[in-house]
Curated annotation (Swiss-Prot):
InterPro entries: Rab-GAP-TBC_dom, Rab-GAP_TBC_sf. SUPFAM superfamilies: Ypt/Rab-GAP domain of gyp1p. This is TBC domain-containing protein C1952.17c. PROSITE patterns: TBC_RABGAP. The lineage of its organism: Eukaryota, Fungi, Dikarya, Ascomycota, Taphrinomycotina. Its main location: cytoplasm. It is found in: Cytoplasm. Coiled coil: none annotated. May act as a GTPase-activating protein for Rab family protein(s).
Amino acid sequence: MDYKQRIEKFKDILNSEEPISLPGLCSLCIQGIPDEYSLRAKAWMLMLEFLPTDRSNWQSVLEKHRKTYTSFVQELLIDPWRKLTLHEESGENSDHPLNTSDDSKWKEYFDDNQILEQIDKDIRRTLPDLSFFQGKSEINKKPSVNNVSENISVNTEDDKVEEVGQKLNYTKITSIDQSQETPVHLSTIDFSKFQEECHLVLQGRIYRLENESTSSSTTALSTPRQSMDSKRTINAEAIAGENKLGLHREAAERILFIYAKLNPGIGYVQGMNEILAPLYYVLATDPTYENYYLCECDAFFLFTQMMVQVRDLYEKTLDHDSDHGIHFLMSKFTERLKKYDYELWENLEEKQIHPTYYSFRWFTCLLSQEFPLPDVIRLWDSIIADQMKARLFGKNDDGFNGAYDFLMDFCCSILIELRESILERNFADSIKLLQAHFNVDMPKLLNLTFELQHLRKTSKNDEDMSYVRKNSYNTNALANSLKNRVLSTYNTVKANVPQSSSSYTDNNKQKEPLEEKRSFFPSFRSSLDGVSPTQGRKSGEENIRTIFAKPTAHIGENGWSNLKVKGSSIFQRFGNFVGDTMRYITEEEESSEEEDLTTSRRKIGITSKRKVSVKRNVI
């Protein structure tokens, strides 16, 4: 179906009066969601089980979740100021800024500041190419320098949150009644003042962190209330800094901070900001939202639902678990690559390139750092849809309830797409390639992933899962590739030969002329070009090109094994040839006491047993 037909199909499903069919929605989404009519935001909410399938319940569910998030912000971000105030007014002097006991409110406050500091640093680095989280704040109503003291003053009698609640005619939430049938319609409330309040509090704590890093120990020990009371107005520098903290960045910081407070077992871990960024971006660019605060509320619960799928990867206690955690996932990924492409897996093993070196970030951040954001969003359409299908049908092979089935196949497709570059590179260059941003066409990778998925689901055994074996190989292309690489080596060697260099000498033998020493070049080049050499090779012996330059070989059951044996033999012959070449022209050789060389065996390309101590130039 074409693009317009897909849009109409999405509209029919999402606007249906009947309960939405999740299997049908997932089948559409796995092929990509059109970037129109807010389709992606609604589809992600449904597939992440944030919205129910019954459209009639959407409004009440959204209002309930937004009300819940608002209470979290009040209690966890703003309310700690009141906790410290009430503790001081109660006359309990046992708690103080230096108290390190677990029940100390001061210790909790400083721990929260450390979390905020780390979150702020990470968010500033998120999506740097788009500057999405680095924009200027555009608060609906900005306080002036003259009246800002009224907005941020800390009243010893009334709590700051209660003041905001009075302005909004909003009742403070102490608990969420699941049986409440008539939730507060938050969409009718003016959130601009509440958002402004959150902005000022969050900004004040972050600026305090920045000031503490350069202030004296005395200033660092001053209480938050003392700092705020001592400055009833925000100075010009703080006002200027207010514009530097963009609304999107502040919203992301609040989301991550609230999540860390609600999940103390896992807290905040670097990489969570990369999981949040695409989710928040999709909602923030949706034109159907009335204001950014509603987007922030929904993004928090979308992020929470996504973390349900990937939480095990962020649990430190599961890092080395044999059945859970990131190392278990990477081992499953390696096993799957071995089945798809044994030669590539073997090459990585021989070079000791462990998946930890390159795939750790792939899995923990869901490849959000490896591709441009539009490609990441398209990839997540398929990942989220595949996760939902696994939960619906209970079929998965990844050991994580299907959360990583599609992602593992996609990562295998990346390696298969880069296989030629990986096979010809050494350890360092391969690592550099795998850790860089990929300049690979996303549709091509997705199509390859779908092929791997189909192959895995229809294969009866591991041998049937071999993807590379089922493709035809053009040996002419292989020969040309080999020729180009060796010609490059040949030209480099020839260009670096000193004019006054001399060949190595046998014991009690005279030096050979320079012209004779260079006589290997015609044979070397003719063996690549398929031209019969004038010297240096036996008559009738096949050269590199004549062996590889055969008609296109459609590999049968044992075809690849035969080609591999043939290739190994040729590469070994070339290795001996180039090795002798290097020893012959680029060395400063020091002959050892024992050399078993005869005059008849001193020509290039003929094997000889010798013991030589060599200092070689590295090319």
